Amino acid sequence: IFRSPLSAEELRDQISDYHESDIADAFEQLSVEERKKLYPLLGAEWVAEIFSYIEDPDEYLQELNLDQAAKVLSFMDSDDAVDVLDELDDSTQEKLVGMLDEESSHDIKMIQSYEDDEVGSLMTTNFDVIHDTLTIRQAMRELIRQAGENDNISTVYVIDKDNRFYGAIDLKDLIIAREGTLLDDIVSTSYPYVTDHEKIDDCIEQIKDYAEDSIPVLTGEKELIGVITSQDLVEVVDDAMGEDYA
């Protein structure tokens, strides 16, 4: 359908019927010029989602001008954006990061500040967090507000008045909680975590044993700064196995 003589609106509607993974597969069959015509049609947010299914998105990002590329990066999860940027030359990296909004730029620089073998280099800042003083109703409202930006919502993290990690709540427990229930009654204060400067090799088995969708990453002062998802973990294990058999 990418090469069909449809109007821009008709083509966009047709493409929307397909999953982003399928669109990514189709992208690889198109020429550079064909993709360049599609990027403005799809928009930065959609392109960012499609890029998450492409093995080497940095190659496709370089088909965009700097302004377009920065917009796409701003819609990517921070850890994915870092992976893409790390494949670019230093000058291009610096220009793109400088064009991002303050929050995206901060998150990317923070992740890039860690050594490759440290937990912090794997984390994403895409997670939902609420304060332990909220009521059930307030917590649900806050979660709905954050859900538009963060899609890792199966686990909701809780911090105290000093912004230190307090625990976690399963989204299901929050949804079914009666309005009069105290937030403290459904928070798991023994929820596992890792610290940002821990070595990945030292804690990978421990994280696997937890069997959680995501694990919070804390600083030495117990400040919640990110999470490691199960998908991140799978990729690390796969990479390690690939090196072992190389």
Identify the residue ranges that each predicted region occupies:
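Hydrophobic packing positions in regular secondary-structure scaffolds
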Residues: 1-245
